[in-house]
């Protein structure tokens, strides 16, 4: 019966586990344990796994008994090592061409029959029952092997014999993880774990090997058995693919290799050789030395020139340009070679390539400046070029890693206790960390390089000096003693003067010194027809010295940091995995040694069952294997630390089908640990959820405490126990009691609380509120769905008629502190999902809306916070206590900063001072003295100055002064609306002053001239969009004292009459000032509106609309909206300023004093008597 030996692929690593330990364990087993499957129908030992593992070369703590004891008649013994290693092979890869197949096996051929001398599997150890989690630490302490020695330290244990072919030798410790090799790259040696052999045993072994080679002509396999005089067999595992066939006995045994890696696309040999050669060139010491010298030259040469005093000569300039051109060529070649050798690893995905390219291009700017006869000293003055070049050069600091690896890196010693050296992980750490450090340092350097030191001689001072010289030369002449004395004095005080030309004539010149300096080190000042050149090399020298020091300092810092990073990365140890890896390697090695015997028995047993008829040899062999296995079991129990009694439970044949594999046990143990961790994680997550819920409940209790505090303060303040907050809270509780188990029950709008404006279709427009209670208005102000900015502006401007600022802050605080118990009925409170959903969808949005409302309140309508300690206390509690507790520290800090900034910039309005009436002497003086202001200055200049005065008064008017008809109160108007009162008084003063100027002239001709000036003044006011001033003029001309002067009006020119008629048409009150409203609606520039019209509109809105809807608690919000629209119309003109200069000469003569309406009337009568 034919049997087939199959080599299976390693088991796939479970990559779905949360921890990376399983990945490394499975990778270690996959690398070290090729799995064999033995099909044996006679002994029913199918699918038995035999592992051949070769891990670290350590031989300590692994004392195993002799395997495969054999004698001619059963009495002799011999020790041999079985090492069946099958590795994957890729014939196209040059890595495997030098390796030949090698299969070491111990077989004896007698009378054409093959007898296997391999031990049967060992009895069960049951490690799963004995080595559990509690004694795992004890096991680690007892059986952790020492670090793996390197090949150079194993001269006493291993001697590697050189074969006729060359192989790639790699240490099998975990330091080889970073090499990208297949299984066939590793040179395994399990003979290290064997005890020393005696001389007789060695001779018997050699005889057996010779018999084996002579008696197996039909077996096609590659045997390469190496032995040495030190009783250690160094076996070399090479990549083989073999097929064993025995036609005479009917045996067909095939061995299949691992599936090779996916082949790379074949590359042309010439191109590969060229790439290798180029890689060797750019990695050579000479190339690196040239690169470092080039970078140093580019970085420092220009600063050195500047620090040397900016010397200039053809030799210096051309030599430096030649070197820089050479560096450009060298850098270009370096970039091309890197592109060819590293391809995608260098371009285009890395920043190194682009900065190298920019650095290369930046050197071209030097040549460009030089060819255009500019200075060579570009880096010392041109900051941008310096920064680009430093960035491109400093990014090459990665050379430090190469230099370290080549000259400074030390080999890892066994005494260091490292199980994992720097590998791809370390290299990646170097690259990532180095790039971040370099970019950070370059960012700092970028900022510091902006510090360019200029000359301390101001340009304005030099130009002033040149102007003085030109004035002296034009006045006295260049040869005059006045000019000569001043110039000589200037020359003595300015030793850096190089060249002077005044009025196109050279006065002073130092050509030798000018030619010896760089062009940019000479400051050239031109003004009109004069030129002055000044030597600036001293300041350039100072700047270059500072730049040199800074550059050297940054380079030293980068070198030091990179050396530390590289050094640490090359000594990297994965400490958390040391113990696990030790367990894996120890158990897998012992499992490999035992399974070699079991697997060999299966293979050879298959041969014997089909080729021999005698069972005596098999029985004797079974007894020998049983005795050997007994000793091996004891050694394993002692080495692992297990004290199981199951060693006596073996069957008569010495085979235990239920023995667990140590690797399987380890994986099972890891699974159990993972299950325990998963259960613990779930428990922690559950407790975290519970803690989160409790934390939210504590937060609710905390904010509800502030609600009660606000309520208590409100009750104390309201002596008559008018309790709006308590009424609001009580209504909320009643609604909760009446609500159904729906989520938005409390947010439904009732006509008893709010009414909306009807649209054209007769349906309510939910965006326009017409009537609502104060509680509903507060809810709409802080809606969770969206923050209505228009509504907020209207409310915050007009709410004071129904709420005080303190009450509004209390309501907003309560709204911010809203909790599920205040908004959700009991049925929904019982559901954690509903509560959490409400917190996410409602509570957070409501708090954000309250934050936006307070931010708008403080930012625009902040006059409520001035001198109001109660309001400040509430605001301070909200910002410093409640909001931080609710995890809104950033929001609290933001609005607190706005509040502090507004308080710091607050300027209190000056107290109102009423205009004192004129005394009798002042009245007499006004009537007698002639006022020539309208004739002494241009009428446009007078109009501009009056406009500027009126705009200053207009822009000082606050929005709150328009509320509740404050300017109409008889006793409180000067306190509530002081700026409006001042503006109105100014209107009357100007109007009376113009009337006085007209009627105080005794002659008609003089009065006509004054009337023409006054009408012209009105025209200029209209051109300036000063309709307030235009109305002042119109009211003075239409006054009874001026309009009655018929004889005077008859002599006014027709052009002035037409201008007056045009002004009267514009400001006509017909159709509610239709013409004026149309004109001002089109005004897009600075403007002073006629404020009397808007005061009339506010009066009409206030008196024509009720505050409440039909004696209910519904506030007429439409009225508030109309008031806000009118006020905002006025306020929009305050934000556009007039950009004219004040004329103090005109303002000093503006004295808007008038004797009063009665005296003006009498003066008018004296000008023209009444008609009888």
Swiss-Prot record:
The chain crosses the membrane at residues 286-306, 320-340, 347-367, 378-400, 432-452, 545-565. Residues 765-903 form the N-terminal Ras-GEF domain. GO terms for molecular function: guanyl-nucleotide exchange factor activity. The keyword NADP does not apply. Residues 34-100, 138-162, 186-246 are annotated as: Disordered. Residues 938-1170 form the Ras-GEF domain. InterPro entries: Ras-like_GEF, Ras-like_Gua-exchang_fac_N, Ras_G-nucl-exch_fac_CS, Ras_GEF_dom_sf, RASGEF_cat_dom, RASGEF_cat_dom_sf. Residues 666-702 form a coiled coil. Keywords: Coiled coil, Guanine-nucleotide releasing factor, Membrane, Transmembrane, Transmembrane helix. It holds the Pfam family RasGEF_N. CDD domains: RasGEF (cd00155), REM (cd06224). PROSITE patterns: RASGEF, RASGEF_CAT, RASGEF_NTER. Its main location: membrane. Residues 34-70, 78-87, 194-241 have a biased composition (Low complexity). It is a multi-pass membrane protein. GO terms for biological process: Ras protein signal transduction. Promotes the exchange of Ras-bound GDP by GTP. This is Ras guanine nucleotide exchange factor W. It comes from Dictyostelium discoideum.
